[in-house]
Amino acid sequence: MKIDLHNHSYYSDGFLSPSEVVLLAKKEGCDVFSLTDHDTTDGLIEAQQQADKLDLKLIHGVEISAMWSNMTIHILGLGIDINNETLQKGLKQHQEFRQLRAEKMARGLGGAGVFGALEKVKLVAKKGMITRTHFAQMLVQEGVCKDMRSVFKRFLTGKKPGGVGGKWAEYDEVIGWIHAAGGKAVLAHPLRYRMTNTKVRRLLNHLSGADLDGVEVVTGSSSSDEITLVSQWAKEFDLLSSIGSDYHGWPNQRVRIGHLQDMPQVNEMVWKDSSWLN
């Protein structure tokens, strides 16, 4: 059975529509699939309609930014009720911050000689939510930088011209939103943060103490050694294991839906004791 529980559409920083993402998931052989846009569930109704046509099991999801030790992390909410008031109230706060952040980023880029950044990035972001990925893609398309890596290095991190710090809800609050909506809270891509392995272990220890349910053991960019390491951490902190490609669909990105290494069979899966596989 092919399962992919971390993917994006153009309702956040993905390239394709929800329908197109679901259609591609079916084409790539997925049996169970989740759409997990950043801080929004707006694409899930369209995704569900397409999944029903294709007889594909869709798990309603979201990827929520959160603060831990003054650092931004991402927590997936899987199997959520998208009509839950607590969840939607929290997501609205984040959406409002994203708009303010985009305006600040554009002003910073203007000061560095990239003029009209906000107007240009709006043409890249198809559904209103503007993310750092949209700014990065815009700067590549404008020929300011040659690739995404150089954009972030020159413009979008730390004290660079377009670097704007996060002001997200704290991790325990975000976990609470997800649980209020009946979902599983899963730390996304634990090895992608700018942390040493020792610090990631401390992160997992803190989050597991705040009732985190699971951790993403397998991602679309994971090496075998990374999978083994995160699998060990999942067992150490009594966390369920999840799997997801983190597909965005931009032409200059290599990750593909459903093309994932195998999950270690010694781990308990995040879909344990759920109806997700029915």
Annotated model-derived regions:
Residues 50-201, 205, 264-277:
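Extended substrate/RNA-proximal surfaces in nucleic-acid metabolism proteins
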Residues 1-71, 155-158, 170-252, 263, ...:
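An N-terminally biased module of ancient metal coordination in phosphate/nucleic-acid-related enzymes
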Residues 259:
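Acidic, carboxylate-rich catalytic segments that either coordinate divalent cations
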